[in-house]
Design a protein with these regions (language model features):
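Conserved catalytic alpha/beta core of Sir2/sirtuin-type deacylases, generalized to analogous enzyme cores
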Residues: 1-238
Length: 238
């Protein structure tokens, strides 16, 4: 009954706003961010036991390991994101929304939505592991990293990237870092264009019959999807 109701709402809507979060990926088996599974153990290698890591987020935000060890895990995780299969949840959603007027806002950083939807229909609110930025940041630019990720993964030694190979900013020489939300997350020109495209879609359809479809959204960062969706559902006429 719930599935039939969802199909009915999708068919009746003039516009569909999808808010996709980590539950979308977890439902497809991508749980290494939060769990100690085989994927995480491959990413961490010997560092799992050396530092007592339990999952990728635990390792990513840890402060006690070397920079080379830190980068080894980032590189392996990002390489996995490039090589892994497309999640079934994303394939199913693409089928449901085929031919519909929709837009997707996501807090996911794993680029799974880009496997099944066009980039101009997606805004990644919390960044994307496929890009790097200056860690300062000294300038407003993000960099695609696929070629470097695959090259550097082959140069990891004993679960650490040699210090001399750590990616550096081409302008100031500081370390690069993944373009994902953190203390130095770059919300520059690229990010603003992404957000404005999303906000323009909302503005254009604020008086139309709009379906807000919240998928896999928890309470870790409710300010990005859950709370705005609740406010718009309450305020918009249809």
């Amino acid at each position: 009954d719930t599935i039939e109701l969802l199909k009915k709402k999708i068919d009746e809507a003039d516009a569909i706003v999808v808010g996709g979060a980590s539950g979308m990926s977890a439902a497809s088996g991508f749980v290494f961010y939060y769990q100690n599974d085989a994927v995480f153990r491959q990413i961490a290698g010997s560092l799992e036991k050396k530092y007592g890591f339990h999952n990728f987020f635990d390792a990513f935000y840890h402060q006690g390991h070397t920079r080379g060890e830190h980068w080894a895990m980032i590189l392996r995780e990002t390489k996995y994101l490039y090589e892994c299969q497309t999640g079934e949840t994303y394939i199913d959603l693409a089928e449901l929304l085929q031919g519909k007027n929709y837009y997707i806002a996501t807090t996911n950083q794993d680029a799974q939505f880009y496997r099944t939807f066009p980039a101009d229909k997606i805004t990644c609110i919390q960044g994307d592991f496929r890009y790097w930025q200056c860690s300062v940041p000294c300038h407003d630019q993000i960099y695609e990293n696929k070629a470097q990720v695959f090259k550097l993964c082959g140069q990891i030694e004993n679960d650490a990237l040699p210090e001399k190979l750590i990616p550096r900013c081409p302008h100031c020489g500081a370390e690069m870092e993944p373009w994902v939300r953190g203390y130095h997350f770059l919300q520059g020109d690229f990010y603003q264009k992404e957000m404005n495209r999303y906000l323009d879609f909302l503005k254009r359809h604020s008086s139309q019959k709009t379906l807000f479809l919240e998928l896999g959204v928890g309470m870790m960062t409710p300010m990005f999807i859950k709370e705005p969706f609740m406010n718009m559902v309450y305020q918009w006429p249809q």
